[in-house]
């Protein structure tokens, strides 16, 4: 592993090494390991999530060493550098026609892919549903038993290297047409109602107490979140700016599905 990292780091500093077959082989091995789930762009530790920047470098370097190839699927034709993921049956993944995942994305057993898209470097945990027209961007990290509802957009990130990927932790529910980008971290068992938009600068305001509590870039565990707005002064007057409101907490329960249904009913959250 350390040798792979050294080769990638050297090629990052000196792009002429991309002509070297040993370098190309090392980069492709890193992408193959991402595809198998033996490497991850980001991973949880006892001290929080860490981002493996050298692996992101390998993904970026993978593009210039790949040649364009035509891919034919029945009457459809594609022309790209990155091969498609294969072997879904042996991996225990259900894939509905028109769903697409790129090689270099790890998809665990029990995942259901409706017509959707998962990009290179992404990680999707066991039992997760990727619903119709949902997209999982490059290097995004999706936990176990997550529900990405129809039209959800999970942002990807390759560059800048220091930028963190979007992280959606285990048992979270992301409602229809939600957008989560710019390295936002949604902690375990959170519920985002339909149309919530979260960027790195979006104010996430907990309104459940006597005084509002503001977060940015992070949704605390088990939070129930809906779209909101707040007044902001501009030269032309006062206007409402979008934000996200934490309106309650999903109750802890060993039965996560029951807990989710209760939260949706209790807070009248559109999904």
Residue ranges and their predicted role:
Residues 93-233, 246:
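Structural signal for interior beta-strand "rungs" in well-ordered beta-sheet cores
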Residues 1-93, 222, 227-271:
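Terminal amphipathic alpha-helical/low-complexity segments used for targeting or macromolecular assembly
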